[in-house]
């Protein structure tokens, strides 16, 4: 599969479509799910994928593993595809065996064997290990979503946490910080709660700020706003969300879920209810929808902003 993914990252293929192409043709992800992950209309994504496949045929791109010297230009798209596959399957609450997230974990670890001296490869593997370690705690028996700060840490997979921490330490040893290392460090900071029973929000803010600086994205900015709200109060977090100028935020579920949480903490039940409703409308996962609906139901019945 890695060989096919490297083919999809050929220089003749437009950079923006390389990762979606890998997700569909190599990892079997549905085009609609890919479109949702990239905040693109399904029809537009389908057209781009068709054009990319046509490009492979017309350009007669060989199905061969590139030389190591050529890997650097293709590696970022491969890493993004592996992480994208994991993120798309993240809501799953069954066994990781034979799942897309299980395949993503396998590919991430295989990459560390092929490229053991690439810090971002190590960082990606650490990120997937640390995220996957909490799988059992993310859902109740009925499938209802459990937010990170409410999870029972006794259900976390300690050996997988230890493996992720070891990979992250190896990555840090190269002294070249990158997106996946920072994202793994964020997950590591959350996993510290299993050891000391608390969340170091100030450490998380420093890491999130670093991530926004080197790999800005809508998700990264929303996550930083959430952390700001935890430290400085909900109004500060809401102001950070208001400052986001990306129009795609209107269709970004985490934006509305975060906004709802901050409005609720600020004592603004009316605004919170509206934001929860928008987040629910944008949620296809039943367990997460049930959780958000319960949060909306528990809001105090009073007037407010």
Which residue stretches match the model-derived regions?
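Amphipathic helix-loop-helix modules that constitute alpha-helical solenoid scaffolds
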Residues: 1-16, 22-31, 40-209
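Alpha-helical residues within the helix-turn-helix
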Residues: 36-38
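Structural motif corresponding to the intra-repeat A-B loop/turn of tetratricopeptide repeats
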Residues: 98, 132, 195-198, 214, ...
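Alpha-helical junction/boundary sensor with strong preference for TPR arrays
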Residues: 108, 115, 175, 208, ...
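Start-of-helix register in tetratricopeptide repeats
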Residues: 120, 183, 219-220, 254, ...
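Residue at a conserved register position within TPR or TPR-like alpha-solenoid repeats
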Residues: 129, 188-192, 228-229, 263, ...
């Amino acid at each position: 599969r890695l060989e096919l993914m490297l083919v999809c990252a050929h220089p003749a293929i437009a950079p923006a479509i390389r990762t979606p192409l890998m997700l569909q043709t190599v990892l079997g992800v549905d085009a609609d799910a890919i479109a949702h992950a990239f905040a693109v209309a399904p029809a537009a994504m389908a057209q781009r994928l068709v054009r990319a496949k046509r490009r492979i045929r017309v350009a007669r791109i060989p199905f061969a593993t590139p030389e190591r010297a050529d890997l650097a230009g293709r590696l970022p798209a491969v890493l993004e595809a592996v992480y994208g596959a994991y993120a798309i399957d993240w809501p799953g609450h069954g066994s990781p065996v034979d799942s897309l997230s299980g395949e993503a974990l396998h590919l991430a670890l295989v990459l560390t064997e092929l490229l053991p001296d690439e810090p971002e490869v190590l960082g990606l593997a650490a990120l997937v290990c640390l995220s996957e370690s909490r799988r059992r705690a993310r859902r109740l028996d009925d499938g209802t979503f459990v937010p990170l700060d409410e999870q029972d840490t006794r259900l976390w997979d300690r050996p997988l946490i230890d493996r992720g921490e070891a990979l992250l330490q190896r990555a840090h040893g190269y002294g070249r910080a990158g997106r996946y290392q920072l994202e793994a460090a964020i997950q590591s900071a959350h996993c510290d709660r299993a050891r000391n029973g608390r969340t170091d929000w100030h450490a998380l803010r420093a890491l999130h700020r670093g991530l926004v600086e080197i790999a800005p994205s809508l998700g990264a900015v929303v996550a930083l706003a959430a952390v700001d709200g935890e430290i400085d109060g909900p109004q500060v977090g809401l102001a950070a969300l208001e400052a986001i100028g990306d129009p795609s935020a209107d269709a970004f579920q985490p934006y509305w879920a975060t906004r709802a949480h901050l409005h609720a903490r600020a004592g603004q039940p009316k605004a919170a209810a509206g934001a929860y409703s928008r987040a629910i409308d944008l949620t296809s996962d039943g367990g997460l929808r049930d959780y958000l609906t319960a949060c909306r139901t528990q809001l105090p019945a009073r007037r407010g902003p």
